[in-house]
UniProtKB/Swiss-Prot annotation:
Organism taxonomic ancestry: Bacteria, Bacillati, Cyanobacteriota, Cyanophyceae, Synechococcales
Domain of life: Bacteria
Family: Belongs to the DapB family.
Name of this protein: 4-hydroxy-tetrahydrodipicolinate reductase
Residues at which NAD(+) binds: 11-16, 110-112
Class of this enzyme: oxidoreductase
Length: 277
């Protein structure tokens, strides 16, 4: 029988972290071994009881590195080591990812906000350590399909704008998913949205953020939303719109579990779910 995959979840009491724990506990080949969260008053409580899953005998801890150290020592086979699933905050995601690699724990990063320079540094660090990991801006298979369609459409349209919509507790803007979509559209090296008029914004930022390629990205934050993205292309006489809507966070769990299962066979850090499917 194949041993279960040891999984640590950081941000365990957050919306995404809680969904990940439910998915891990419900899977046949994963085992929850750590729950990291700094919510006041929760240190030492059983994560299963906190989430209504029954007692799991995994205590909530705020000691990130202490948890990774304990897990790395208990999992002796480095090639098939433990996995960290991180849904925390952009302000700590770089340090969390680097610490996981240093402890020989495979990072699966769902937290967005890494800069291109930080991502490059982490890729080099993981390659030197021969530790596989993944930075996934969006775990939805449907979003991967939208991104692929957007990249294909970018060959034929010179005008395009991207809009992402999220709940009002999301800390970063634009979303990592929106940035990733723009990057895929830009791989041809073309420029978008050639100027037709001399634009003037009476309210700064009205036209969204403009990338070097000319693509414009817009971010909306409202209660009631989960995660949504729209890519609109325009040409004389027509528009072409791609849209993906996540209405429940359970939609991400197949992608999370797929990444957890595959990441231990990697020797470096990959960026994007499309690299794994």
């Amino acid at each position: 029988m194949t041993p279960s995959i040891p999984v640590v979840v950081a941000g365990a009491l957050g919306r995404m972290g809680a969904e990940v724990i439910k998915a891990v506990v419900g899977s046949a080949d994963c085992m929850l071994v750590g729950a990291i969260d700094n919510t006041p008053g929760k240190e030492g409580s059983d994560i299963g009881l906190e989430l209504g899953l029954g007692e799991l005998e995994v205590a909530v801890t705020a000691d990130f590195e202490g948890c990774l150290c304990a897990v790395s020592q208990s999992v002796r086979d480095a090639e098939a080591g433990a996995v960290l699933v991180d849904f925390t905050h952009p302000s700590v995601v770089y340090e969390h990812t680097r610490a996981a690699i240093a402890y020989g724990v495979h990072p699966v990063i769902g937290t967005t906000g890494l800069s291109p320079e930080q991502l490059s540094d982490l890729c080099q660090f993981a390659a030197k350590a021969s530790i596989g990991g993944a930075v996934i801006p969006n775990f939805s298979v449907g979003m991967v399909l939208l991104q692929q369609a957007a990249a294909a459409a970018a060959r034929f349209y010179d005008h395009a704008e991207l809009t992402e919509l999220h709940h009002n507790c999301k800390a970063d803007a634009p979303s990592g998913t929106c940035i990733k979509t723009a990057e895929l559209m830009e791989e041809l090296g073309k420029s978008f949205n050639p100027a037709e008029v001399d634009e003037h914004e009476s309210l700064a930022g009205s036209r969204g953020g403009r990338r070097e390629s000319g693509l414009r990205l817009h971010s909306l934050r409202l209660p009631g939303l989960v995660a949504h993205q729209e890519v609109m292309f325009g040409a004389p006489g027509e528009t072409y719109t791609l849209r993906h809507d996540t209405i429940d966070r359970s939609a991400y769990m197949p992608g999370v579990l797929l990444t957890v299962r595959k990441v231990r066979s990697l020797q470096t850090l990959v960026y994007g779910l499309e690299r794994l499917i």
